[in-house]
């Protein structure tokens, strides 16, 4: 399977956009390095992290994409909201992957501080977006290798 034979989608949260734009740039830069063309990629923006699973489900249901990369940045605040958001988004993404058998790459940073988020979005810890792009391409290849045919 060549890199040019698939399509993937990227769902990006607008909340904490300064971080998520950097993550998106990391994904796109790595995909370019892997010779994935712009016409193979669809990027959609959602208001916040909680909305990611619904759009991921819609994209998976369309059967147009062989993987979906979900990007967000949830940064702990003073309330329990952080815990609920992190749990809902991770569970929702996993459910979509299992229901539609489409790799859903969980690219949602869950950090205690903004500094930690920026460190993982192109800062001293690198750009996790590149890792998630690699994971998407790897999973597309694995799913193709282990393709199940209807009998």
Swiss-Prot record:
Organism of derivation? Coxiella burnetii (strain CbuK_Q154) (Coxiella burnetii (strain Q154))
**UniProt: (2S)-2-hydroxy-3-oxobutyl phosphate binding residues:** 78-79, 120
Q: What class of enzyme is it?
A: transferase
Reactions catalysed according to its record: (2S)-2-hydroxy-3-oxobutyl phosphate + 5-amino-6-(D-ribitylamino)uracil = 6,7-dimethyl-8-(1-D-ribityl)lumazine + phosphate + 2 H2O + H(+)
* HAMAP family hit by this protein: Lumazine_synth (MF_00178)
Q: Which InterPro entries match?
A: LS, LS/RS, LS/RS_sf
Subunit-structure text: Forms an icosahedral capsid composed of 60 subunits, arranged as a dodecamer of pentamers.
Instruction: Please give the Gene3D superfamilies that the UniProt record associates with this protein.
Output: Lumazine/riboflavin synthase (3.40.50.960)
What are the positions of the active site? 81
Keyword Methyltransferase recorded: no
Protein name per UniProt: 6,7-dimethyl-8-ribityllumazine synthase
List the pathway annotation: Cofactor biosynthesis; riboflavin biosynthesis; riboflavin from 2-hydroxy-3-oxobutyl phosphate and 5-amino-6-(D-ribitylamino)uracil: step 1/2
Q: Which domain of life is it from?
A: Bacteria
